[in-house]
């Protein structure tokens, strides 16, 4: 009997995929409520640690991502290879390539920046002179270009100016008079230079040159033919002309 019952039951083929066997009783609703009331949390699984199955086997853990080790000597080796590849090129350079004619020009040095003169911070503001003060100063300068200390004190008090202002004005006026005098001397030198006659006065024509040319134009049979007049060369009078022009200047 027992054999027949076993033969009547369908045989279940074993699953090719592995499965985990569950140990313990199935979770019920009451047990779930107890866990929630206790604040139970499912343990978090770390990818770096292998997971253990209930049947004692271990699952393959996911490989942890770690940065690849950096080789310190790789950069130095690459730089060394680049330097070695440059050396034969430099050694094989021809002399005309190394000549300064074909080499690039050196970079030009920039000119230094122009530094402006800075005025003093405690510089006093410039006080403009009135028209009456300028006329009095100019009149005094024409009388006397250098004032003594007593004259300067008296003159400055009469114009309601300080002695320093009068002193500086006279210094500037003397410098201006010197510049004007030098300009006048330069003009006199330019005017005193003798004016040389131009080169056209030295050109001499052959005797009877223009007359001969006129005769050839009209021809021998022309009724309007005129006798040729001798023309003296201009070069004979160049000395007299130059002498008269020199004295005229």
Swiss-Prot record:
This is Homeobox protein MSX-1. Disulfide bonds: none annotated. The gene is MSX1. InterPro entries: HD, HD_metazoa, Homeobox_CS, Homeodomain-like_sf, Msh_Homeobox_Regulators. It is found in: Nucleus. Probable morphogenetic role. Acts as a transcriptional repressor. It comes from Gallus gallus. Its main location: nucleus. GO terms for biological process: BMP signaling pathway; embryonic morphogenesis; ossification; regulation of transcription by RNA polymerase II. Residues 116-125 have a biased composition (Basic residues). GO terms for cellular component: nucleoplasm; nucleus. GO terms for molecular function: DNA-binding transcription factor activity, RNA polymerase II-specific; RNA polymerase II transcription regulatory region sequence-specific DNA binding. Belongs to the Msh homeobox family. PANTHER family: HOMEOBOX PROTEIN MSX, HOMEOBOX PROTEIN MSX-1. Residues 1-125 are annotated as: Disordered. It comes from the Eukaryota. The keyword Transferase does not apply. Residues 71-83 have a biased composition (Low complexity).
